[in-house]
Amino acid sequence: RRRLEPEIAQRSCRLLSDAELDRLEREAVGFGAQDRTMNDIYDSHHEFHHALLAPAATSWDIRILSTLWRASERYIRIGWGSLDPDPQEHARREQYHVELVAAFRQRDPEVAADAVQQHLSRNEQTALLALGPGRSRVAPVS
């Protein structure tokens, strides 16, 4: 994912319409709703990331990414599910995804790639913390 997603983001940021970015921003804001758990948003979260990359992704890219996304699903649900009781987690979830859309809006390939790379790194670190010893007291990565 670290090699493929940033590379596709570099191309996609120039192809996404303003209307699609507006729609994705509204979706990102919805990820922060206090009443939505990770299980509630998982499918729309997957679709959000797919939509960010879709304009520049080949069918082969989507096939590979879908396999990788589904393979990581259990860890995402465990890691972020354990954070759901923390009201600040919902705000972070929203912020991280709004930041992704903002990076794509700049239409700068390096900015978009860096934002995706940072997003993946945060996710990896949070998942490792959530799955490690003492996971009941997970502190999310900022």
Sequence positions of predicted segments:
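C-terminal all-alpha effector/ligand-binding and dimerization domain
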Residues: E25, V29-A33, R77-S142
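Hydrophobic, amphipathic alpha-helical faces that serve as interaction scaffolds
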Residues: R1-L16, H46-D86
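Alpha-helical structural segments
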Residues: R3, E7, R11, D22-G30, ...
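Amphipathic alpha-helical linker/stalk segments
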Residues: R14, G32-D35
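Hydrophobic packing residues in well-ordered alpha-helices of helical domains and bundles
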Residues: L21-L24, I41-H45, D61, L65, ...
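Short linear motifs at protein or domain termini
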Residues: R1-R14, A19, L128-S142
